[in-house]
């Protein structure tokens, strides 16, 4: 389907707006993936707060121009599916990684975080906000328990020395 200039400008503006407010971006090649599988992926993306769109490469290059995802311009070759994480930096990468396990033809091309290309595996393994808080609380709890054990051991040693 041919797009006129106004449609192209609208697509570039839409993707640029999504890129401006995103925490991370992932580019993938979805050739050979069934329509049903892609529909499921789009539904999961909406639920995870991920903006996802198939965009022509020239329009994608123009859309990310001047944003922190300008580093992705070289990856826009062949069919490109671009996803921007809005709520959590690892959401799109985690979604694509899980989807690629089920669909062997789905290939993750690149990922970007804070203006630099990043390994999608690293982005996918980032803990969510709740997981990070839980880990922090666990560390604090272990530290205070360890301090208590050392204090009791010091008191025991003092009594033995006396």
UniProtKB/Swiss-Prot annotation:
Pfam families: Ribosomal_L10. GO terms for biological process: translation. Gene3D superfamilies: 3.30.70.1730, 6.10.250.2350. Keywords: Ribonucleoprotein, Ribosomal protein, RNA-binding, rRNA-binding. PROSITE patterns: RIBOSOMAL_L10. CDD domains: Ribosomal_L10 (cd05797). GO terms for molecular function: large ribosomal subunit rRNA binding; structural constituent of ribosome. GO terms for cellular component: large ribosomal subunit. HAMAP family: Ribosomal_uL10 (MF_00362). NCBIfam families: PRK00099.1-1 (NF000955). Belongs to the universal ribosomal protein uL10 family. Part of the ribosomal stalk of the 50S ribosomal subunit. The N-terminus interacts with L11 and the large rRNA to form the base of the stalk. The C-terminus forms an elongated spine to which L12 dimers bind in a sequential fashion forming a multimeric L10(L12)X complex. Forms part of the ribosomal stalk, playing a central role in the interaction of the ribosome with GTP-bound translation factors. This is Large ribosomal subunit protein uL10. It comes from Vibrio vulnificus (strain YJ016).
């Amino acid at each position: 389907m041919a797009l006129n200039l106004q449609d192209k400008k609208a697509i570039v503006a839409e993707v640029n707006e999504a890129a401006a407010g995103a925490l991370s971006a992932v580019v993938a090649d979805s050739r050979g993936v069934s329509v049903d599988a892609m529909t499921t992926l789009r539904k999961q993306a909406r639920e995870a707060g991920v903006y996802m769109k198939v965009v022509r490469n020239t329009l994608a290059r123009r859309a990310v121009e001047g944003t922190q995802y300008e580093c992705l311009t070289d990856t826009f070759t062949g069919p490109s599916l671009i996803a921007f994480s809005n709520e959590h930096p690892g959401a799109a990468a985690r979604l694509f990684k899980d989807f690629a396990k089920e669909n062997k033809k789905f290939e993750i091309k690149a990922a970007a975080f804070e203006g630099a290309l990043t390994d999608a595996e690293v982005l996918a393994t980032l803990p969510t906000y709740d997981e990070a808080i839980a880990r922090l609380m666990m560390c604090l709890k272990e530290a205070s328990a360890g301090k208590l054990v050392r204090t009791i051991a010091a008191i025991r040693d003092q009594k033995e020395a006396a």
